[in-house]
């Protein structure tokens, strides 16, 4: 299978970037960033419950809409079943 010069060039550039990425200054910066990852100031903030975010409000509105739709469907189904007088009434039978 012949190798395309473009593929060889891309692989060579990727290998060169990997080897070149071993910079001591970059490694030192990564270690320093890893040491400063946890901060007590960030840990103590938590989630504000007094002012819910907009996503939470949208979630509860959607949940309420779904619950209302299910309740209305159940009410309509119950009303149809209670309105049918007997098992041979046309509205209470299936389509088959």
Swiss-Prot record:
<dbReference type="GO" id="GO:0055036">
    <property type="term" value="C:virion membrane"/>
</dbReference>
<keyword id="KW-1133">Transmembrane helix</keyword>
<dbReference type="GO" id="GO:0045862">
    <property type="term" value="P:positive regulation of proteolysis"/>
</dbReference>
<dbReference type="GO" id="GO:0046776">
    <property type="term" value="P:symbiont-mediated suppression of host antigen processing and presentation of peptide antigen via MHC class I"/>
</dbReference>
<feature type="topological domain" description="Virion surface">
    <location>
        <begin position="22"/>
        <end position="54"/>
    </location>
</feature>
<keyword id="KW-0261">Viral envelope protein</keyword>
<keyword id="KW-0472">Membrane</keyword>
<dbReference type="InterPro" id="IPR008647">
    <property type="entry name" value="GN_domain"/>
</dbReference>
<dbReference type="InterPro" id="IPR034707">
    <property type="entry name" value="HSV_GN"/>
</dbReference>
<dbReference type="GO" id="GO:0019031">
    <property type="term" value="C:viral envelope"/>
</dbReference>
<feature type="signal peptide">
    <location>
        <begin position="1"/>
        <end position="21"/>
    </location>
</feature>
<dbReference type="GO" id="GO:0044177">
    <property type="term" value="C:host cell Golgi apparatus"/>
</dbReference>
<dbReference type="GO" id="GO:0061635">
    <property type="term" value="P:regulation of protein complex stability"/>
</dbReference>
<comment type="subunit">
    <text>Interacts (via N-terminus) with gM (via N-terminus). The gM-gN heterodimer forms the gCII complex.</text>
</comment>
<dbReference type="GO" id="GO:0039657">
    <property type="term" value="P:symbiont-mediated suppression of host gene expression"/>
</dbReference>
<dbReference type="GO" id="GO:0046980">
    <property type="term" value="F:tapasin binding"/>
</dbReference>
<feature type="topological domain" description="Intravirion">
    <location>
        <begin position="76"/>
        <end position="96"/>
    </location>
</feature>
<feature type="transmembrane region" description="Helical">
    <location>
        <begin position="55"/>
        <end position="75"/>
    </location>
</feature>
<keyword id="KW-0946">Virion</keyword>
<comment type="function">
    <text>Envelope glycoprotein necessary for proper maturation of gM and modulation of its membrane fusion activity. Also plays a critical role in virion morphogenesis.</text>
</comment>
<dbReference type="GO" id="GO:0046979">
    <property type="term" value="F:TAP2 binding"/>
</dbReference>
<protein>
    <recommendedName>
        <fullName>Envelope glycoprotein N</fullName>
    </recommendedName>
</protein>
<keyword id="KW-1015">Disulfide bond</keyword>
<dbReference type="GO" id="GO:0090087">
    <property type="term" value="P:regulation of peptide transport"/>
</dbReference>
<keyword id="KW-1040">Host Golgi apparatus</keyword>
<dbReference type="GO" id="GO:0033644">
    <property type="term" value="C:host cell membrane"/>
</dbReference>
<keyword id="KW-1043">Host membrane</keyword>
<dbReference type="Pfam" id="PF05702">
    <property type="entry name" value="Herpes_UL49_5"/>
</dbReference>
<dbReference type="GO" id="GO:0044165">
    <property type="term" value="C:host cell endoplasmic reticulum"/>
</dbReference>
<dbReference type="GO" id="GO:1903317">
    <property type="term" value="P:regulation of protein maturation"/>
</dbReference>
<keyword id="KW-0812">Transmembrane</keyword>
<dbReference type="GO" id="GO:0046978">
    <property type="term" value="F:TAP1 binding"/>
</dbReference>
<dbReference type="GO" id="GO:0016020">
    <property type="term" value="C:membrane"/>
</dbReference>
<comment type="similarity">
    <text>Belongs to the herpesviridae glycoprotein N family.</text>
</comment>
<keyword id="KW-0732">Signal</keyword>
């Amino acid at each position: 299978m012949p190798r395309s010069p473009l593929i060889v060039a891309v692989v060579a550039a990727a290998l060169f970037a990997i080897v070149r990425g071993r910079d001591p200054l970059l490694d030192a910066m990564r270690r320093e960033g890893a040491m400063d990852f946890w901060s007590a100031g960030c840990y103590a903030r938590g989630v504000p419950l007094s002012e819910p975010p907009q996503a939470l409000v949208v979630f509860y509105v959607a949940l309420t809409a779904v619950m209302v739709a299910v309740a209305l469907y159940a009410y309509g189904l119950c009303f149809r079943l209670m309105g049918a007088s007997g098992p041979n009434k046309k509205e209470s039978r299936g389509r088959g």
